[in-house]
UniProtKB/Swiss-Prot annotation:
Protein source organism: Brucella suis biovar 1 (strain 1330)
Protein name per UniProt: 4-hydroxy-3-methylbut-2-enyl diphosphate reductase
Positions with a binding annotation for (2E)-4-hydroxy-3-methylbut-2-enyl diphosphate: 48, 84, 134, 175, 233-235, 278
InterPro entries per the UniProt record, alphabetical: LytB/IspH
Record's catalysed reaction(s): isopentenyl diphosphate + 2 oxidized [2Fe-2S]-[ferredoxin] + H2O = (2E)-4-hydroxy-3-methylbut-2-enyl diphosphate + 2 reduced [2Fe-2S]-[ferredoxin] + 2 H(+); dimethylallyl diphosphate + 2 oxidized [2Fe-2S]-[ferredoxin] + H2O = (2E)-4-hydroxy-3-methylbut-2-enyl diphosphate + 2 reduced [2Fe-2S]-[ferredoxin] + 2 H(+)
GO molecular function: 4 iron, 4 sulfur cluster binding; 4-hydroxy-3-methylbut-2-enyl diphosphate reductase activity; metal ion binding
Gene name linked to the record: ispH
Cofactor note: Binds 1 [4Fe-4S] cluster per subunit.
Cofactor: [4Fe-4S] cluster
Amino acid sequence: MTQQRPPLEIRLCGPRGFCAGVDRAIQIVVLALKKYGAPVYVRHEIVHNRYVVEGLQARGAIFVEELDEIPAAHRNQPVVFSAHGVPKSVPADAEAKNLFYLDATCPLVSKVHKQAMRHQRLGRHVILIGHSGHPEVIGTMGQLPDGAVTLIETVEDAHTCHFDDEDNLGFVTQTTLSVDDTAGIIKELQARFPNLAAPAAESICYATTNRQDAVRAAAPGCDLFLIVGAPNSSNSKRLVEVAEKAGARMSMLVQRAEDIEWEQIGDISVVGLSAGASAPEIIVDEIIDAFKAHFDVKIELAETTVETENFLVNREIRDVELTVKDMAFVNGEHRVVGISKLMQGK
């Protein structure tokens, strides 16, 4: 006699997973491989997800941390800069080495670069709210001369920082931060420096805000909340924090279904599921299938908004056709079809 599986509700968040900037960055590498052939070099992980990186490596991408790692024999092959953005010195170095490069910096990160440079042009010292060592922070700080930017990571930093000219300050933020935590830091800075200039537009990107809002709405009543993402993915780690603060009994970050420790989960009846902006949909499907092996699963789509943003790839590769098959290694079947199947229980 077959043992009956316990019932389980999975609240599948929407939006989740790839944002337009991540989609664009991966497409740039895929299209470069189609147009120019392998190898295509990529400086730093194109996005913070090993599954994506390994999938691109299998297609002929080679990942390096510095341009000096590109062999002289391959200097005629393209190099792609990651979605996180790079300091100004990197494209300058590429040009000095006569390298052909494609910049996959997210357009919303580029917007933050422009906001920081505008502050400086107006004579302001720039305050960057972000996490030390994150590639996006390194790239943003690298848009301005040494000493022109001060990094603030916490409310305590905001409370203790000092500046020579407190009347000429402007701030920008890393795009992937927690909306709530950033608000606290900005509030402290504005209390201490009343003339602090804000950026012309919100720095935290729409995708970060949307994913956090969806998790926040779905978390109450969840016994467990899983976020698909990498340990070095800032926006994924923030989603884990948001789930905990919003009422999930337990939340955790997983990269693959094999990371789930079933014996530690215990007695659960409601699970929340979302994915960071660099996590592919195919892993979300994998995790749902893993739960179906243990439970009688019912999918509830917990959608707070629908994203329609789309960013163009670089002009040099717009003549190359991108097919569903080209992106199947991360998307699986077309997303709309996938959601339809999930709602039908596959």
